[in-house]
Amino acid sequence: MARQIAHPASICAWNTDMYGVDATKPGAQEYYDSIIELYASWGVDFIKVDDICVKYGQAGNENTIQYGGDEIELLHNAILHSGREIVLSLSPGPAMLEQAEHLRANANMWRITNDLWDSWGNIMEMFGRCDSWSPYVSEGCYPDCDMIPIGHLSIRGCEHGLSERWTRLTKAEQRTLFSLWCIFRSPLMLGCELTDVDEWTMSLLTNDAVLGLTKHSHGAHQVLRTFDFIVWQAEGEHGEQYVAMFNIAGWPDTFSVSTEKLGLEGAWEVTDLWTGEKEGTIDRTLTAAVETHGVKLVCLKKA
């Protein structure tokens, strides 16, 4: 069966004993139906499929990049046929923006970046990617910013010549990453060793106010971007506004954004989501001192 439906030119570039399925072959759908039926019988709730969101080096040409749309549809149909609700996650990235509607129709999560690691350069790239993909975030459809590289990493790995280590991101950069992922509503997947999570890392992972953005906000979008400053905004379930002010410069600085730019009128009470501190009321301008590569993440409620 596998030999009959395999696509001889669809070979995983980094694991060449893996072949894709030719969706035009008789039995292709039935093959995936049988696989997903088995997983469903085991009670599986989440399936991640690699070498499909984008497929590198197809047909022996290392420079080709293709979209695995036909196989994605086979998987989507197989999940429907199984009768079980199963989350379908696709990688690697970056996903093709022109395939956004097809992805939304056939998957729940799809990677919008290459493998993301603990470097500020990787985090910087995500601001642009999140801006491009923000219109396509909706319930059940989540562009995926990739794993969160905090804590103890690469215990048995050697990615790009880097072996076991604690994250190279500063504490400010870790908060920036977590704030962007949460306001954008990316899936949150940890890339660290869970048995030795330190107190700082645990404080990031257990901040209910910040995590709540993934469930209780919508409409996240980039409000403005300059050479040293980025602002994101989202709306809460009861009209509250969430604002993230990111310092992307190499030095600490003070930034301001007007309530007019945020589309707000009147007075608003300010609460810092990371500290929980109430910081008074604003009516014209939100101003914050932000450390290097750091973030000011606040909730605004009508006063």
PLM regions and their residue ranges:
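Glycan-recognition surfaces
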Residues: Q4, P8, T24, S34, ...
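Carbohydrate-binding surface patches
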Residues: R175, W181-F184, M189-G191, R225-L264
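Solvent-exposed beta-hairpin/edge-strand motifs
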Residues: E260-G276
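Conserved beta-strand positions
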Residues: I47-V49, V54-G57, L90, M245
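Loop/turn elements at helix/coil->beta-strand transitions in domains of secreted/extracellular proteins
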Residues: W42-I47, S82-V87, G239-E240
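Catalytic cores of secreted or luminal carbohydrate-active enzymes
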Residues: T176-L224
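Active-site-adjacent "subsite" loops/lids of carbohydrate-active enzymes
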Residues: M1-W42, F46
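C-terminal beta-strand-rich structural cap/linker in extracellular carbohydrate-active enzymes
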Residues: T281-A303
